[in-house]
Amino acid sequence: MRIWVDADACPAPIKELIVRTARRLRIPAVFVANKFISIPDSACVSTVRVELGPEIVDEYIAKHAEPGDFTITQDIPLASVLVPKGVTVIDPRGELYTEENIRERLSIRNFMQDLREAGGITPGPRQFGQKEKQRFSDTLDREITKRFKLQGN
């Protein structure tokens, strides 16, 4: 079990929470980015810096994540690749991507992208605050607990 983090766009409070969770539960966490990121030093936390370029971080995570791992990302196309592989995918706001909802999320994302490209006005990202941080924490804890139970820990 490993936690993969699409770290370029991950909010700082979520990164901090992941580091604390990894230390507390001794789960390896890997922060993947195409730029320098500052992550506290820890035996179970590491960073991987990939080259600049579109989708390079996503490709790295997709290649290395295995069934039973966790990935934290807001990239829906990446989630749509990982979920069928048996990777638990959570966005930084605490939404769990599943076999049941990933196709709909990808369809909405593609529609909104088409709308933006056609010059349509789409809403910007919602504000990120304590409520979102708590929802993420709750979802991550719940999913890790499920995984430990499946493994008999």
UniProtKB/Swiss-Prot annotation:
Protein name, per record: UPF0178 protein Sfum_1097
Family label: Belongs to the UPF0178 family.
CDD domains in the record: PIN_YqxD-like (cd18720)
Superkingdom: Bacteria
NCBIfam families cross-referenced by the UniProt entry: PRK00124.1 (NF001095)
Species assigned in the record: Syntrophobacter fumaroxidans (strain DSM 10017 / MPOB)
InterPro entries: UPF0178 (IPR003791)
Pfam family, one: DUF188
Disulfide bonds: none
Record lineage: Bacteria, Pseudomonadati, Thermodesulfobacteriota, Syntrophobacteria, Syntrophobacterales
PANTHER family: UPF0178 PROTEIN YAII
